[in-house]
Amino acid sequence: MANYFNTLNLRQQLAQLGKCRFMGRDEFADGASYLQGKKVVIVGCGAQGLNQGLNMRDSGLDISYALRKEAIAEKRASWRKATENGFKVGTYEELIPQADLVVNLTPDKQHSDVVRSVQPLMKDGAALGYSHGFNIVEVGEQIRKDITVVMVAPKCPGTEVREEYKRGFGVPTLIAVHPENDPKGEGMAIAKAWAAATGGHRAGVLESSFVAEVKSDLMGEQTILCGMLQAGSLLCFDKLVAEGTDPAYAEKLIQFGWETITEALKQGGITLMMDRLSNPAKLRAYALSEQLKEIMAPLFQKHMDDIISGEFSSGMMADWANDDKKLLTWREETGKTAFETAPQYEGKIGEQEYFDKGVLMIAMVKAGVELAFETMVDSGIIEESAYYESLHELPLIANTIARKRLYEMNVVISDTAEYGNYLFSYACVPLLKEFMTTLQTGDLGKAIAEGAVDNAQLRDVNEAIRSHAIEQVGKKLRGYMTDMKRIAVAG
């Protein structure tokens, strides 16, 4: 199989990379009705599989789970989760032939085996669904021409998909139809009904493409969402300890600092995050972020280039074939780092203290978010997609670090994201070593002293922060989500 994206000509590549349309609420007036009365079979019962299934069932759809024979016989976690939640469970052979929509929610590395197993069992004219397009775009999986291929990709972990639905809302979602597999022209109707059944239409849906979703998703998770947080955690911890900070305090400042900082990001973008700082600290964070962007830009561009060309995917798939040797080695090495093994701090750190003593961390967040966004947009990805794959998801990933440090982040994210995270962080840490030696008192671990501020400089910095393209599109999208939530709750 050949990488699908690389089989397209340049015009087709640009068209698919740039496909992104914010869909109106009125386009979902029929809700999930297109799939009602039809049989939906989900393959896989992990976080996305279970929680999407729960939402879809609560939306009135007929949901069952197809699992491998051995998973059922051995009563593995997937079988237990499905049965304990009252779902019908059966083998591929028992359930797939009757399915109108088969939703493949297994890990990326299992997709080819799963598709090879289920495709011969699928009835003529059925539909195959994904929540990530890696198998179609990067692996180049060939699907029977009578099968409709669609994607519904919630921009949150599975647990969040469920919790937001229970609140009467949903999570922002990308939907797409594979242009090579829409024989009856019903792909968009299926995708819209599926998205509505998960609650995504209440938070905002982008009509995208398999290509745009995959390329932007890989870029976001490798750089700002995971790679930058891992590299920043290791660098900041080592710097604090080297400067004489208690390792336990240093660990807590970083572990919970990312979550506290990005909560402001979630509520009001980079503007609000920077506004949490004193004026002298804001000016310093801005200056540091500009330095970081200059240093890291080539690394971000290399990751984007390798994602676009398929170099990243081919390297990762080679590691799959080698029993994940690189992935498992990097995972083990991360677990042995000083940050991961540091003692816990029992004292309290106030919310504002995380901002006041984390100026460098704020600069890293700002630089990483803007670089990821800019690099994606420069590569042909539309701003809305770039926003969701950079700034929007960052607080969710930061929350995993707050739970159990980097270990938890790497457990929760996909193996694909974890592999890309290590590639980035292993390159970023040495890249920033010299920069870390130039830090001043007040950049990390201590608050910046109050001092005189040049009004013109502060005015210009505030304007530069607020006028960045990600702040403009972010304000629009966050406003839309707020309005949608208000309507949903009122309803």
Curated annotation (Swiss-Prot):
Pathway: Amino-acid biosynthesis; L-isoleucine biosynthesis; L-isoleucine from 2-oxobutanoate: step 2/4; Amino-acid biosynthesis; L-valine biosynthesis; L-valine from pyruvate: step 2/4. GO terms for molecular function: ketol-acid reductoisomerase activity; magnesium ion binding. It is an enzyme of class 1 (oxidoreductase). Binds 2 magnesium ions per subunit. Pfam families: KARI_C, KARI_N. The active site is at 132. Belongs to the ketol-acid reductoisomerase family. This is Ketol-acid reductoisomerase (NADP(+)). The gene is ilvC.
